[in-house]
């Protein structure tokens, strides 16, 4: 399984912040540290990775991405075996404007009741130290790679 995503960053007074997504739905409702993610989504066969990353950012954040030159951050492998390819883009969005696509699932389990939930229930800006705590552990390397790239430029 493969996903592609965009790590949006901004600089406020010389300090870098990154935008992360919290997954929606009842399974994730009470999880915080280690539960957040880069806005990303699954890649179908023969899809362009960067195009998928841009599409998924729009679907999960609800705001089209305008980024002329995304910075490649490489890939990371999650515990599940899923490979996540990521790019960084500089930009700014207001988390209050976030609108996500939705998914349906039976909830509560074995109830026969199907409910709809947002794929992402919120997005927030984080300083790198906080982002490392919030992110799925495998994705923390993406923040480190971004900071390395920004130091080099």
Language model segments and positions:
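N-terminal strand-loop-strand
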Residues: 1-37, 87
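Functional cleft and adjacent loop/helix regions within the main domain
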Residues: 35-39, 45, 89, 151
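Active-site-adjacent beta-strand/loop module that shapes the phosphate/pyrophosphate-binding cleft
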Residues: 75-112, 124, 146
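Short, charged/polar surface micro-motifs in flexible loops or helix N-caps
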Residues: 12-15, 25-28, 44-45, 80-82, ...
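The catalytic Nudix box helix
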Residues: 38-73, 127
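Non-DNA-binding regulatory cores of transcription-related proteins
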Residues: 115-121
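Charged phosphate-binding loop/patch that engages nucleotide di/tri-phosphates or the phosphate backbone
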Residues: 124, 128-153
């Amino acid at each position: 399984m493969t996903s592609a995503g965009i790590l949006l960053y901004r600089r406020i007074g010389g300090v870098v912040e990154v935008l992360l997504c919290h997954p929606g739905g009842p399974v994730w409702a009470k999880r915080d540290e280690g539960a957040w993610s880069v806005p990303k989504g699954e890649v179908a066969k023969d899809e362009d990775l960067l195009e998928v990353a841009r599409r998924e950012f729009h679907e999960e954040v609800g705001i089209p991405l305008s980024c002329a030159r995304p910075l490649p951050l490489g890939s990371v492998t999650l515990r599940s075996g899923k490979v996540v390819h990521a790019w960084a883009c500089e930009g700014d969005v207001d988390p209050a404007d976030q609108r996500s696509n939705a998914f349906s699932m039976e909830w509560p389990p074995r109830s026969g009741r199907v409910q709809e939930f947002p794929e992402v229930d919120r997005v927030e800006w984080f300083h790198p130290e906080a982002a490392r705590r919030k992110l799925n552990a495998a994705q923390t390397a993406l923040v480190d790679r971004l900071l390395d790239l920004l130091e080099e430029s």
